[in-house]
Curated annotation (Swiss-Prot):
InterPro entries assigned: Fmt, Formyl_trans_C, Formyl_transf_N, Formyl_transf_N_sf, Formyl_transferase-like_C_sf, Met-tRNA-FMT_C, Met-tRNA-FMT_N
Binding residue positions for (6S)-5,6,7,8-tetrahydrofolate: S114, L115, L116, P117
Transmembrane segment boundaries: none
Family indicated by similarity: Belongs to the Fmt family.
Name of protein: Methionyl-tRNA formyltransferase
The EC number(s) this enzyme carries: 2.1.2.9
Amino acid sequence: MRLVFAGTPEPAVVALQKLIDSEHEVVAVLTQPDARRGRGRTLHPSAVAELAQAHGIEVIKPTSLKADTGDGRLVRQRLAELQPDCLPVVAFGQLITRDLLDVAPHGWVNLHFSLLPAWRGAAPVQAAIRAGDQLTGATCFRIDEGLDTGVILSTLEETIQPTDTADDLLTRLAYAGADLLVDTMTGLEAGTISPREQTGEATYAPKITTVDARIDWTVPAEVIDRHIRAHTPGPGAWTMLDDARLKVGPLVTVTDLPDVPTLNPGALHATRDAVYVGTGSTPVALGQIQPPGKKMMNAADWARGVHLDQEASFE
């Protein structure tokens, strides 16, 4: 099939590469405009744009797909000229307007990293870890006017491991989902896919903000563990110590807590080799800490460097 791929960040690159390597023809790519990154705040193309350019594929970078914008009109004109059979989508980052939904015979097919209708929205991987789900997956569905409400074309399941960070899980889903997306394109072309409506209770995973990533030390230890893993690496779980905001890496698994006193939520206890924090249940052992303006470091090394007061407590 002739495909116009829509995607932007690194997880979408895996799917684009799989489509390029498949029997299908990627004739163009839609992606977000260049963004400023790094200390110099210089403009950089998206990960998807870089891959497409390396393969000589046309790249279109609209600021909006709305029909009343210059970019929106350009996209409509170009799609009419390209005549794609389908538009696969992976984390594109822009709203597909109603009048564009029928621009191709097979429509727009989104690869979403959850088992819909669970975790509709922008952050399904983080939501699944935070909620303590043991099973998630990926869904290819046809985009309609709703928020991830379209008919399901294909799915796969993926077990969430007890130590998975959002990055760990997203990486596995990106690779497995890329194969699923290619198979879905092939199935649509062959006419072997039977779309089905979504059933069951819907849950939602809105975009995560920095405020959302703050750690609440009053909740049970297992909830804090999931919270930290769900926000690793970005935006990064964080807490306050005095007036400093510290990022907190995944916790260290400990089987027992020798010589660790009873700790109130947030209270710190440092030994030679470890740093413990009180929670709403049992204390937890910190793995890594990132002080302001510095890189992640071993929590025990950090504690020695700042000479923790016996009354020190995270807020």
